[in-house]
């Protein structure tokens, strides 16, 4: 009976396929056919009664199966089955599990298979807890480590088996079975393996394409405040694809804050983003930028950048310290190199990063006289440690500034435009040429360009360009600031102070769509 049962199932399925009628909706006219298409389940249930099966079991099975089909179908099926004599169905003899008359002949074993079969038996007896797959891997590794003399007995045994096989099956041809078409699960698995090796660029492009506002791909990255209505947060620039967590959510987890309602995420903390991953390939693929506006962040070939003309406070060009009110004076020292950029004056001690914006304070907070910069000994990595200009000597922060060697013409040209050439003692840097220009007063005397004291307040976006006291030169942000990030490096201002910075287009924000 066990032999016949699978065969009956198979013939039923074949006839189902031939008749083309799906089993739950058996048509009435199939009643004339000897083996009705819709009765797959019932035919199997009635057959065991012929085969001296105890009657209770098929009946139980039948009852559970009957729930699947409507009453009319069941009646039609039983009508057909009543008049059919199952003894007339021819039963072909099945040999070795294949429907062909001749049994399937296996290939003779090769040397490795001889070794693996013998070794697997031995190991499986000794270590019954070993998983079969692990066992196979181990056997493969061991086989590769064997030398010729150790392999010889297995090779000889394999040769003997091959000769024997040829005697037994003289007309044997190796006919590998056709592979079945790839199942969905397998395809998904393959896709998954492909996706584990996706470059960050591809992820970035996909993020851009998926986002509903992808008309301005990069803009979204820098302006999370706009997307308050979105269910998922704005796409963030890719970190390396080691984790599947969306980078924005990972930041939230690190900061330990719950996600606010409405899917609105706090601004991205760029300390955790490796901007070096945003390679030039990615940046060249973003066609939605206003190129002219973007150019103001790029270091020009020896000429000062064009100052921006927004109503809001911007850095004119890039690192130059000047508010838009003082643009004519400020335009000269716009592209100060990073070595020359003055270190930030320390914020007043009473102010926490999250503090609300303070009104401009009285001038005592501002430095009274232009202090002398004291050059510290240069660090071995060419990252200079400058002591900050501060009226309170106790508050000396050390600022590490990565240097990029810019052309000497860059320095000298930018010095020609400086309004006041009052030179302090030049930096004594052994690894730079004597053409390194003296530091001019105009770059240090903040009170020339600022409303007095207003650059201390963290949210003084309206009053000054010292965006939270020049904090994007902080040691916390500098290490990731790779040269490629000159094009996209402006985002490395820490957005931990208050999300309201995002409401107005400060200099990090590019075009509004």
From Swiss-Prot:
GO terms assigned for molecular function: chromatin binding; cis-regulatory region sequence-specific DNA binding; DNA binding; DNA-binding transcription activator activity, RNA polymerase II-specific; DNA-binding transcription factor activity, RNA polymerase II-specific; RNA polymerase II cis-regulatory region sequence-specific DNA binding; sequence-specific DNA binding
Biased composition (Basic and acidic residues): 56-67, 160-174
Biased composition regions of type Low complexity, renumbered to the chain: 30-41
Gene3D superfamilies membership: High mobility group box domain
Primary location group: nucleus
Motif window: 9aaTAD 1: 275-284
Motif 9aaTAD 3: chain residues: 464-472
Record InterPro entries: HMG_box_dom, HMG_box_dom_sf, Sox_N, SOX_TF
PANTHER family: SOX100B (PTHR45803), TRANSCRIPTION FACTOR SOX-9 (PTHR45803:SF1)
Annotated protein name in UniProt: Transcription factor SOX-9
Positions with biased composition (Polar residues): 42-52, 387-423, 489-513
Domain observations: The transactivation domains TAM and TAC (for transactivation domain in the middle and at the C-terminus, respectively) are required to contact transcriptional coactivators and basal transcriptional machinery components and thereby induce gene transactivation.
Region (Disordered): 1-67, 160-273, 334-447, 483-513
GO biological process, one term: negative regulation of biomineral tissue development
PROSITE patterns associated with the record: HMG_BOX_2
Modified residues (Phosphoserine): 64, 211
Covalent cross-link Glycyl lysine isopeptide (Lys-Gly) (interchain with G-Cter in ubiquitin) as placed by the record, residue numbers: 402
UniProt-listed SMART domains: HMG
Originating organism: Canis lupus familiaris (Dog)
Record's subcellular location: Nucleus
SUPFAM superfamilies: HMG-box (SSF47095)
